Amino acid sequence: MFRGITPINLDVKGRLAIPTRYRDEIQDRCDQKMVLTVDHRERCLLLYPLPDWNTVEASVNALPNTSKAARRLQHMLIGHASDLDVDGSGRLLIPALHREHAHFEKRVVMVGQGHRFEIWSESLWQAKNEAYLAEDDDMSGLEDLRL
């Protein structure tokens, strides 16, 4: 399981160093094979171990092509998907198109989300968190959740 928030500097080539605490799990789960795509609702990237991505991709591909929402999701998630290999130094090269989509500069934030990571520009992540704190706490539907 991937959890936690890690600020990371991209190098001049646009490579992201996977935090050390995740490297063994990534090796065990997917032999360093990852898939990067864009989030269809936010200006962030989604990074999946290959087996988890295969499950997501199959679900998205099973949606009806006649649905406008399904086509949009297919275009965003599958159309922007890139296969990436973690190199021997634990780095991933983030393609330029993905960096542009997510407004990456030098500083990014890697956010563990269970079976995947979200990767945000640090400034967009900070703005998102400020917006969360400013929102009213509408927890309808989550009454039984124990935190």
Which residue ranges define each predicted feature?
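Short, Lys/Arg-rich amphipathic alpha-helical interaction segments
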Residues: 123-147
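Short, charged/polar surface micro-motifs in flexible loops or helix N-caps
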Residues: 41-44, 51-55
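A positional/architectural concept
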Residues: 3-16, 20-40
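Short, structured motif recognition centered on aromatic/hydrophobic residues
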Residues: 14-18, 90-94, 117-119
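Short, solvent-exposed interaction modules
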Residues: 61-92, 98-99
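Positively charged
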Residues: 12, 54-58, 71, 75
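A short beta-strand-loop micro-motif that forms or neighbors metal/cofactor-
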Residues: 28-44, 103-120, 124, 136
